[in-house]
Amino acid sequence: MTEQDLDAAHRLSLSVRWPHRLEDWAFIQRLGAGYVAENDEGLIGTALCWSHGTEFASIGMVIVAGAWQGKGIGRKLMAMVMAELGSRNVLLHATAAGRDLYARIGFQQIGEIHQHQGTVFKSPLMPLQPGERIRPLGSRDAAKLAALGARATGMPRATVMAALQDVAEGVVIDRYDEVIGCAMLRRFGHGYAIGPVIAPDIERAKALISHWTGTYGGAFLRIDVSGSSGLGPWLTELGLVQVDSVVAMVRGDAPLPDHGVRQFAIINQALG
């Protein structure tokens, strides 16, 4: 896949009712590698992949045009991106349509991601601990942000987090000049996406999310949280209802996050 394929890839994703804007495609394409399937009518399939250091990678944006599904195109595209990634342990988020294909090529379920979205009109003020404050993410926070992302996911995140800073707004929880949590928000699809949200515990995660739901009250918001996050009922009360879920899968070994910090919401279903 090259930059010249983005317009056609965007049309393909719209045809299967995925909300990505052309700018959303451009962001993820710049960060990774990908392959397309074409015929005389044009582009009919896509698959992208992203390396996270030398041991881990993720796969996403695996799409086949409706009229061409069930003809082995998805399997061929997956084989190409898997070859691109070599011996890395590979993560992905599977829709119901793709889950069986991924299971047949060695992926196993390790969790779920729940997609919440909607509009928040009244955002609660969540208290922090003494000495803690939420402040804007600064340019000098890059190394701290990368370290926090690596601890929360168990994978190197410097490249992804740096790229996010170019397209997203960010806030951190600062405790005596130590960054212990972060949340980012960017334009995505029909409105805005919150993620990642990284925090030591659920109360601080709620404080970070509340910052953005308050700042962007009345706007359409989306957040994808882990099924074990405990945030579902609270998000629903805010007005961000669950509309879909996908299965988190891995081929190989899953990364081992630091137990002292947790990624409550992912960046997106492609990058994790």
Where are these regions (language model features)?
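Conserved N-terminal entry element of GNAT/NAT acetyltransferase domains
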Residues: 1-3, 120-139
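Active-site-proximal cofactor/substrate-binding loop regions of enzyme domains
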Residues: 1-89
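Intrinsically disordered, low-complexity, positively biased terminal segments
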Residues: 2-7, 38-39, 51, 55, ...
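Conserved catalytic-core motifs of GNAT/GCN5-like acyltransferases
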Residues: 89-93, 108-122, 242-254
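Conserved active-site tyrosine of GNAT-family acetyltransferases
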Residues: 102-103, 107, 235
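Short, structured loop/turn "capping" segments at alpha-beta junctions
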Residues: 110-112, 127, 155-160
